């Protein structure tokens, strides 16, 4: 009987068998393999020298080695070479199988690591955005005294007992009249000329998005619902969010100057004071809050309404606030004392108010209602002097032009109507696409351009009333739009919680 070693493929001198694989080996070769690896070379199972079983056979008589110059010698050399190749091939197959298993395991680990990295990256991004809304800026660390011209902090944040309304005293009425006279005189001096610095229509039509900021408000409660620019420095941006916060943002430094917290519901209206470091906000929590920007604190809470506050406008004097509400009243309040001077409702209508806006002169103002009416009021007499019917659906926004005689209105009927206050009639209707929503209307400071925000952002040139610009960058509904100084840029906010800027 002839035995062949599974390692050398030769007849072994001291054959033995492995009980693990049942293969025959040359003892000296298998002992060396076990010393190095401790396993059976065929199936890699653990194997020790003690487990090897010797095989007793008659020793074959080895033939004499052939001469190196004979054909048998060549055949023997080829046979030896073949044996070596086979042994090497066997080893390579074993190594290949091991490598494949290791590679498969590594690929599974890599896939799992990629998933973990993607999840952590998403969490880090959300955390950074949340941090951006909470991180105080250096300018807010040191408290500053509120100037004497600003409202007192006494009773800030506490409910106000309005008691009897103060009323429109002769002094207040005279103050309003004097301011209106000054503004009317200035408007007449300007005439129909527009500022030389104002961006021309052909330049405006080339505006494109140049910046987008999404870290102002909370990522967990997305949506910016209100927008205003500081009249004296349009680089300062004011926003109100669904996260109940009011944010003051600096466009030039791209930094949050203040995050103002205090409302218990979303913030739907915000207004910048033109000359003081004050901002105003209104919310469905039925409060109007007056904030000090340097201190990042609330200095006054005006409780003029019993239901959600839907509109907010600052009088040209900078001393009084107009507000509208779901409680069907409009209110006129003093920002210095926080007291409500007068509250009026149209008893014949019995309908909630949706928005309110002062005329540039401040002696009249407009309100929008849930039943599609635009009402013009005389502030001094507190009387409804004109009504503009024609819309269908709740009024969503109204805007007076700086020229003093144009009024733009929008409702849930996919249209914008232009009214001439001198003739008290509708002279133009901008019919938009079906299901187009309009949430914000505003004229630029010169009355040359009209911007509307809603489903998209659209810019119209007044008098011709033709669209010259259209932006669709917001992934959600646009809730606010505003012009920079001399229309050098345009800002917009949306439910995608982004603040976007457009310019050349």
From Swiss-Prot:
Q: Molecular function (GO) terms listed?
A: identical protein binding; ubiquitin protein ligase activity; ubiquitin-protein transferase activity; ubiquitin-ubiquitin ligase activity
Tell me, in one coarse class, where this protein mainly resides.
nucleus
- At which residues are the WD repeats? 219-259, 262-301, 304-345, 348-387, 390-429, 433-472, 473-503
| Modification type N6-acetyllysine: residues | 122, 179, 244, 261
Q: What SMART domains does the annotation carry?
A: Ubox (SM00504), WD40 (SM00320)
Query: Do the record's keywords include Transferase?
Result: yes
User: Could you tell me which residues belong to the region May mediate interaction with PSMC5?
Assistant: 68-223
Location of the U-box domain = 2-73
Which family, according to UniProt?
Belongs to the WD repeat PRP19 family.
Instruction: State whether it acts alone or in a complex, and with which partners, per the record.
Output: Homotetramer. Component of activated, catalytic and post-catalytic spliceosomes. Component of the Prp19 complex/PRP19C/Nineteen complex/NTC and related complexes described as PRP19-CDC5L splicing complex and PSO4 complex. A homotetramer of PRPF19, CDC5L, PLRG1 and BCAS2 constitute the core of those complexes. The interaction with CDC5L, PLRG1 and BCAS2 is direct within this core complex. At least three less stably associated proteins CTNNBL1, CWC15 and HSPA8 are found in the Prp19 complex.
Protein name listed in UniProt: Pre-mRNA-processing factor 19
Q: Which organism is it from?
A: Homo sapiens
């Amino acid at each position: 009987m002839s035995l062949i070693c599974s390692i050398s493929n030769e007849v072994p001198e001291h054959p033995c068998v492995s009980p693990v694989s049942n293969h025959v080996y040359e003892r000296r070769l298998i002992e060396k393999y076990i010393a190095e690896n401790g396993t059976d070379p065929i199936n890699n199972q653990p194997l020790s020298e003690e487990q090897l079983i010797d095989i007793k056979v008659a020793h074959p008589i080895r033939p004499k080695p052939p001469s190196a110059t004979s054909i048998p010698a060549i055949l023997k050399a080829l046979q030896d070479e073949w044996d070596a190749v086979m042994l090497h091939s066997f080893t390579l197959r074993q190594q290949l199988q091991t490598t494949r298993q290791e590679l498969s395991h590594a690929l599974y680990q890599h896939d799992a690591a990629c998933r973990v990295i993607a999840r952590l990256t998403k969490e880090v991004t959300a955390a950074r955005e949340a941090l951006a809304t909470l991180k105080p800026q250096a300018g807010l660390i040191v408290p500053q005294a509120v100037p004497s011209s600003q409202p007192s902090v006494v009773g800030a944040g506490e409910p106000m007992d309005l008691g009897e309304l103060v009323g429109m005293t002769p002094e207040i009425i005279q103050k309003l009249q004097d301011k209106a006279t000054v503004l009317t005189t200035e408007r007449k001096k300007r005439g129909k000329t527009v500022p030389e610095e104002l961006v021309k229509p052909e330049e405006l039509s080339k505006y494109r998005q140049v910046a987008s900021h999404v870290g102002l408000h909370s990522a967990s409660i997305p949506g910016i619902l209100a927008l205003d620019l500081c009249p004296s420095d349009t680089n300062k941006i004011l926003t109100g969010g669904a996260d109940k916060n009011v944010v003051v943002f600096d466009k030039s430094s791209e930094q949050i100057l203040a995050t103002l917290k205090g409302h218990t519901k979303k913030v739907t209206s915000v207004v910048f004071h033109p000359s003081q470091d004050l901002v105003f906000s209104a919310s469905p929590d039925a409060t109007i809050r007056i904030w000090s920007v340097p201190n990042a604190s609330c200095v006054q809470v005006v409780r003029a309404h019993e239901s959600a506050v839907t509109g907010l406008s600052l009088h040209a004097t900078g001393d009084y606030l107009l507000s509208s509400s779901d409680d069907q009243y409009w209110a006129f309040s003093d920002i210095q004392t926080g007291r409500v001077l007068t509250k009026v409702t149209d008893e014949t209508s019995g309908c909630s108010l949706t928005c309110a806006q002062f005329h540039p002169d401040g002696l009249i103002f407009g309100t929008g209602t849930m039943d599609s009416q635009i009402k013009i009021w005389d502030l001094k007499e507190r009387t409804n002097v004109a009504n503009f019917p024609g819309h269908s659906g709740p009024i969503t926004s109204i805007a007076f032009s700086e020229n003093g005689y144009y009024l733009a209105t929008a409702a849930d009927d996919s249209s914008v109507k232009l009214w001439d206050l001198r003739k008290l009639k509708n002279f133009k209707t901008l019919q938009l696409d079906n299901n187009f929503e309009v949430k914000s209307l505003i004229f630029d400071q010169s009355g040359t351009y009209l911007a509307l925000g809603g489903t998209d952002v659209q810019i119209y040139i007044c008098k011709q009333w033709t669209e010259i610009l259209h932006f669709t960058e917001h992934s959600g509904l646009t809730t606010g739009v505003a012009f920079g100084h001399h229309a050098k840029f345009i800002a917009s906010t949306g439910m995608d919680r982004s603040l976007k800027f457009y310019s050349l």
